[in-house]
């Protein structure tokens, strides 16, 4: 079964996120558990936690259908020790918030070397940062998102994701989230079913589908291989509809959150309905 949704706002309280997801016909959703552009956040109160759990139950969202995202400020591969520690503390807080909310996944961008340390050293720092957080939490999987490779961001090659996973001690609590726009911008073609087959065969060989814990379904304004991260609405960008139809009709993408981060929230309900219809079309074929 496909879990399909979008990254919804938690404005006004975390308990509003499940309701907003339900309003657009979603069977999955992503959210920030705190302001993503600030380092610090007030601790979660028992009331906030209870309200969120009650809302998830009311709208029939299990933890497997929810893919929270951490703060954009965090850089788990930071070359400077003080800044690295600040990021590690913030990441641990994000993991602990998920733990408190009964969530089992935390999606994050791996990190950047900022042109100051070798790529291999940065990847090792990211893996160690994950190890530190996993050692102090239970039940939450660290889900590494592939990047477009913009600037000095790592995680744009499947080999880089595999290297991070290789350095994580508890393999049962690490996974990846593949963003289609990022993959396309990083040079992984998705424009035809044949291209999708090739790209995901490579993913399966290098990373492994056992580590796929979520996806971000985004078309791309950016050009193929441009290393530029610019999302677009489904079918309106340089990837086109075929990739998303192909994903909907492939069982390897069942049972994980498939999250829209497309640029027009006003049509998320339409995009979700279209994605759902692609499954039905396959079932009837």
UniProtKB/Swiss-Prot annotation:
Residues annotated as binding Zn(2+) 1: 69, 109, 145
PROSITE patterns, A to Z: AP_NUCLEASE_F2_1 (PS00729), AP_NUCLEASE_F2_2 (PS00730), AP_NUCLEASE_F2_3 (PS00731), AP_NUCLEASE_F2_4 (PS51432)
Keyword DNA damage: yes
Protein name: Probable endonuclease 4
Keywords: DNA damage, DNA repair, Endonuclease, Hydrolase, Metal-binding, Nuclease, Zinc
Superkingdom in the source lineage: Bacteria
Classification via Gene3D superfamilies: Divalent-metal-dependent TIM barrel enzymes
DNA repair found in the keyword field: yes
Chain residues that bind Zn(2+) 3: 182, 229, 231
Catalytically driven reaction(s): Endonucleolytic cleavage to 5'-phosphooligonucleotide end-products
Family affiliation: Belongs to the AP endonuclease 2 family.
């Amino acid at each position: 079964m496909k879990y399909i949704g979008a990254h919804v706002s938690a404005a006004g309280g975390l308990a509003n996120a499940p309701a907003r997801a339900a309003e657009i016909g979603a069977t999955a959703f992503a959210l920030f558990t705190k302001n993503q552009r600030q380092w610090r956040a007030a601790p979660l109160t028992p009331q906030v936690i209870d309200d969120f759990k009650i809302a998830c139950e009311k709208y029939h969202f299990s933890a497997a259908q929810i893919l929270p995202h951490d703060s954009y400020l965090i850089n788990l591969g930071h070359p400077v020790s003080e800044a690295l520690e600040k990021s590690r503390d913030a990441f641990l807080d994000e993991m602990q918030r998920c733990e408190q909310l009964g969530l089992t996944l935390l999606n994050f961008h791996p990190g950047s070397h900022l042109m100051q340390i070798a790529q291999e050293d940065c990847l090792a720092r990211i893996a160690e940062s994950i190890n530190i957080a996993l050692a102090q939490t239970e039940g939450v999987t660290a889900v590494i998102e592939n990047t477009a490779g913009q600037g000095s961001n790592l995680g744009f090659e499947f080999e880089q994701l595999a290297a991070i996973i290789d350095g994580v001690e508890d393999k049962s609590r690490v996974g990846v989230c593949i963003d289609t726009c990022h993959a396309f911008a990083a040079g992984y073609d998705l424009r035809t079913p044949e291209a999708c087959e090739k790209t995901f065969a490579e993913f399966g060989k290098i990373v492994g589908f056992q580590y796929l814990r979520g996806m971000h379904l985004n078309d791309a304004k950016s050009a193929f291989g441009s290393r530029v991260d610019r999302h677009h609405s489904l079918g309106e960008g340089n990837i086109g509809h075929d990739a998303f139809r192909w994903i909907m009709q492939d069982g390897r993408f069942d049972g994980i959150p498939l999250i829209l981060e497309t640029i027009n929230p006003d049509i998320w309900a339409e995009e979700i309905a279209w994605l759902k219809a692609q499954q039905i079309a396959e079932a009837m074929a």
